[in-house]
Amino acid sequence: MKQYLELMRLVRTQGISKVDRTNTGTLSIFGHQMRFNLSHGFPLITTKRCHLRSIIYELLWFLNGDTNINYLRKHHVTIWDEWINEKGDLGPIYGRQWRAWGTADGSYIDQLSDVMLQLKHNPDSRRIIVSAWNVGEIKQMALAPCHVLFQFYVANGVLSCQLYQRSCDMFLGLPFNISSYALLIHMVAQQCDLQLGEFIWTGGDIHLYRNHLKQTDLQLKRNPRPLPQLIIKRRPASLFQYQFDDFYLSGYDPHPAIKAQVAV
């Protein structure tokens, strides 16, 4: 994943010093795009070990429309622990917005179900979009959405997807985000009998936290290795019926993990 390392190097060498919500301090750039051809391999970074297990369980949690941490804790996934309240709830974050966006008349919109219908019956639509940026509910969320909007695109039986991410934690968050959306595209493509195309990632405020700079320098010294392949072992009846054991990663040979503290 040379694209990721090139962006990391750009932020490290040319990023502007900024203050931030967490008071940690960042080096930041604004606006960048990366493209990943999913037919060339699954984009899971190899210059450090990335915890695919957490990525899979988090995505299944989102797809379920869940916002309570209990499901993640049951499966020993801790990536949201810093933001929970005393009841283990995170407010109307991604899963709620994807599956049950509230409307003015009190009803709900299942954006993902609508997207699946469009991909199957009207794949040329320019409205195959899912948004998590519900302005009316942001203050109720434990953390405002970072990856805010994604759009699917079908051409000649090939499925691509573009994500806009308003805020990007380059060292800890972005590797998860890239792999999570790549996983989602694999699942959607299987459900819709489409071939894999590109994942296009577009970032807004792309930053390295100052307490991640030593780890960044270490990672930039490492050479990327061949990408693994993602194998989906069965085809469930719908997008919302996948299970963790449906996924198998072949050929993942990363460098050792690099630990870093999350900025809260």
From Swiss-Prot:
It catalyses: dUMP + (6R)-5,10-methylene-5,6,7,8-tetrahydrofolate = 7,8-dihydrofolate + dTMP. Keywords: Cytoplasm, Methyltransferase, Nucleotide biosynthesis, Transferase. The active site is at C146 (nucleophile). Its EC number is 2.1.1.45. GO terms for molecular function: thymidylate synthase activity. GO terms for cellular component: cytosol. PROSITE patterns: THYMIDYLATE_SYNTHASE (PS00091). DUMP binds at R21, R126, R127, R166, S167, C168, D169, N177, H207, L208, Y209. (6R)-5,10-methylene-5,6,7,8-tetrahydrofolate binds at H51, D169, A263. It is found in: Cytoplasm. One of its GO terms (biological process) is dTMP biosynthetic process. Belongs to the thymidylate synthase family. Bacterial-type ThyA subfamily. Catalyzes the reductive methylation of 2'-deoxyuridine-5'-monophosphate (dUMP) to 2'-deoxythymidine-5'-monophosphate (dTMP) while utilizing 5,10-methylenetetrahydrofolate (mTHF) as the methyl donor and reductant in the reaction, yielding dihydrofolate (DHF) as a by-product. This enzymatic reaction provides an intracellular de novo source of dTMP, an essential precursor for DNA biosynthesis. This is Thymidylate synthase. It comes from Baumannia cicadellinicola subsp. Homalodisca coagulata.
